[in-house]
Amino acid sequence: MGSINPPQILDIRRSKFEESIPKQVEAGLLSSPKTLPALLFYSTEGIQHWNRHSHASDFYPRHEEIQILKDKATDMAASIADGSVVVDLGSASLDKVIHLLEALEAAQKKVTYYALDLSFSELTSTLQAIPTDQFVHVQFSALHGTFDDGLQWLKETPVIRDQPHCLLLFGLTIGNFSRSNAAKFLHNIASHALVESPSQSSILLTLDSCKVPTKVTRAYTAEGVVPFALESLKYGNTLFQQDGGENVFDPEDWYFLSEWNYVLGRHEASLVPRSKDIKLGRPLDKIVVGKHEKVRFGCSYKYDSEERKELFGTAGLRDVKSWSKEGCDVAFYQLKCCPN
């Protein structure tokens, strides 16, 4: 039987990320085209709405990831070095990663799994849901902070920095970045987490190759996505009120728009005024969002084989293994540093 001690949550925040969000909101709404920052959508309530949305029957990325993990987790676990620090960059979907953790335990790999998340309460829920008493070889902990906080922690923490590292990027996380920023982000991960032990350290990520507009848009308009999108406006109001402002947004004034961009090969999610120009509340009362003007808040890039090859190459990485299943557009890739 495993340890009865509850897993620890380590606060690795170098600053409170919430404090920067109002400035990011203002900058995005003053830009052209207008945007909203990703952090605005990941309040505790926002994450809960997203989890409900991702469990909808039409949301194929999650279902395909789980199918592949159930079938291939043993082989994935074999590719992770014994003694590794496994950091899950976005831990909301325990129902996915549990298959890999169970395979690591069955292989008697002595690893420590760190769930990283922006939400302390979501981390608490994640850790409470793990049947830790069923694990002897796999240990559990959590990191409260951003991606950047997690990478800095890996690079600077004594003992941790000298162990092999495996970074998990499930949930098509890398698809949320523009193609150039995705390569920069992967390169940043490599420079912080892979270079100390390049032969044993790796990134394990998922990418989606589906460019069928009907399948993609159906997935991203599935049940739960509208509450997820509108929750960001409520969270924004809370943050601006803490700074002495008023309700900047009225969620009733907006609707959610889902589109496929044929040119860029990506899904685009936006919030749009319902029926009139919208003047925002103080302190953004000088900003007007025009009727039908799109305020984009999310993209999901899809990768064909050439785009995937370019992504990994630009990041200075090579895919050493991949896992998928027949009929699935999603695949898992294990990336390592290119040899010098």
Swiss-Prot record:
Enzyme type, top EC level: transferase
One of the GO BP terms on file: methylation
Pathway field: Alkaloid biosynthesis; ergot alkaloid biosynthesis
GO MF entries: methyltransferase activity
Keyword terms: Alkaloid metabolism, Methyltransferase, S-adenosyl-L-methionine, Transferase
InterPro entries to which the protein is assigned, alphabetical: EgtD_Methyltrsf_superfamily (IPR051128), MeTrfase_dom (IPR019257), MeTrfase_EgtD-like (IPR017804), SAM-dependent_MTases_sf (IPR029063), SAM_MeTrfase_EasF-type_put (IPR017805)
The enzyme's E.C. designation: 2.1.1.261
Catalytic reaction list: 4-(3-methylbut-2-enyl)-L-tryptophan + S-adenosyl-L-methionine = 4-(3-methylbut-2-enyl)-L-abrine + S-adenosyl-L-homocysteine + H(+)
Family of the protein in this entry: Belongs to the methyltransferase superfamily.
Function: 4-dimethylallyltryptophan N-methyltransferase; part of the gene cluster that mediates the biosynthesis of fungal ergot alkaloid. DmaW catalyzes the first step of ergot alkaloid biosynthesis by condensing dimethylallyl diphosphate (DMAP) and tryptophan to form 4-dimethylallyl-L-tryptophan. The second step is catalyzed by the methyltransferase easF that methylates 4-dimethylallyl-L-tryptophan in the presence of S-adenosyl-L-methionine, resulting in the formation of 4-dimethylallyl-L-abrine.
PANTHER family according to UniProt: ERGOTHIONEINE BIOSYNTHESIS PROTEIN 1
NCBIfam families: methyl_EasF
Assembly and oligomerization: Homodimer.
Protein name as catalogued: 4-dimethylallyltryptophan N-methyltransferase easF
Gene from which this protein is expressed: easF
